[in-house]
C-alpha cells in the first residue's frame, strides 16, 4: 500500500516543530524538490487567497480546501480555467459547539498547465 508522506510544511506562524515559518508566496520550486503536490487549507479572504492561487499552482499541482461556492464567483473564473478537479466533501465543523456549520467545502486541484475541463466528484 502506498502511503503519503509530508515532505514540506510551512505556515505564517509557528505551529509544529517541523514547520517552517514563512509566507507561502515566498516558496520556490527548489524548496519543493521531491514533492509531488501542494496541499493547503488557505485563508478564504480574497486579499490573502488570490496571491496563493497566483503562486502555488505555478510550483506544483496544488489542492486547496475552499468553500464550495467559490467556484461560482466571477473573480474565480480565470482560476477555474486551471482547475483540474473539484471534489465535494460537504459541511465541515471546525470546532465542537452547538452551532453546526452551514458552509459546504470542496477540494480544488489547480495546475498552471491544465487545459482540459474541470472534473467534478460529488459526495
Where are the predicted features?
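Class I S-adenosyl-L-methionine-dependent methyltransferase catalytic core
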Residues: 1-123
Amino acid at each position: 500500500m502506498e502511503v503519503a508522506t509530508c515532505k514540506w510544511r510551512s505556515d505564517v506562524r509557528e505551529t509544529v516543530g517541523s514547520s517552517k515559518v514563512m509566507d507561502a508566496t515566498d516558496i520556490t520550486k527548489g524548496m519543493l524538490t521531491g514533492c509531488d503536490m501542494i496541499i493547503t487549507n488557505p485563508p478564504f479572504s480574497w486579499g490573502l487567497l488570490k496571491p496563493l492561487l497566483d503562486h502555488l499552482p505555478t510550483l506544483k499541482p496544488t489542492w486547496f480546501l475552499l468553500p464550495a461556492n467559490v467556484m461560482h464567483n466571477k473573480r474565480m473564473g480565470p482560476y477555474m480555467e486551471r482547475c483540474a478537479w473539484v471534489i465535494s466533501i460537504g459541511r465541515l465543523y471546525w470546532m465542537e459547539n452547538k452551532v453546526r456549520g452551514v458552509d459546504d467545502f470542496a477540494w480544488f486541484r489547480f495546475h498552471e498547465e491544465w487545459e482540459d475541463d474541470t472534473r467534478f466528484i460529488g459526495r
